Amino acid sequence: MSRIGNRILKVPANTEVVIENNHITVKGKLGELHYSFSSLIKVNLENGEITTVRSNEEKTTKQLHGTTNAIIKNMLIGVSEGYKKEIEIKGVGYKATLKGNEIEVIAGYSHPVTLALPSNLKVELPKPTNIIISGIDKQAVGEFAANLRKIRKPSPYSGKGIMYKDEQIRRKEGKTASK
């Protein structure tokens, strides 16, 4: 039994939810999100509460039940509060700059790495070594942050690289010289 799928989601104040056929639209003070869910799942809106009900007890339906409920919850939080990820760049000469609708990262390669900024995200650089990614779509914020981190993952030996602000890097000792 999917406990996640059985959650009752409360619609925040100043948030409008429209459900028609297998499509849900959530509008809030920060923007609007859309999601098309499976026909095996039924989404109900009553008295400012959203419930999801599955049509049968098959394994894939149970999986879709929990996933649909979690995505709708993320949509409700996204349009009312938004999501934010902070990234730190550590290393000598490592930095990032915004150039138009691209971010250019210098991370120890022979060339700078550029990534196109998604239109639905806001990217800020308070310092050249700090990046703040914010938006209403949790999946888009997380994916762009992961793509940035993938440019130069943090090294367990030196601690240099691109990492999330709250990320703890498990450090390793280097080799010791033999006598």
Curated annotation (Swiss-Prot):
Domain of life per record: Bacteria
Signal peptide: none
Gene Ontology molecular function terms on file: rRNA binding; structural constituent of ribosome
One Gene Ontology term, aspect cellular component: ribosome
Coiled coil: none
Gene Ontology terms describing biological process: cytoplasmic translation
Keywords: Ribonucleoprotein, Ribosomal protein, RNA-binding, rRNA-binding
Stored InterPro entries: Ribosomal_uL6-like, Ribosomal_uL6-like_a/b-dom_sf, Ribosomal_uL6_a/b-dom, Ribosomal_uL6_bac-type
Cited Pfam families: Ribosomal_L6 (PF00347)
Entry's family note: Belongs to the universal ribosomal protein uL6 family.
Function: This protein binds to the 23S rRNA, and is important in its secondary structure. It is located near the subunit interface in the base of the L7/L12 stalk, and near the tRNA binding site of the peptidyltransferase center.
Oligomeric form and interacting partners: Part of the 50S ribosomal subunit.
Designated name of the protein: Large ribosomal subunit protein uL6
Phylogenetic classification of the source organism: Bacteria, Bacillati, Mycoplasmatota, Mycoplasmoidales, Metamycoplasmataceae
Primary gene name: rplF
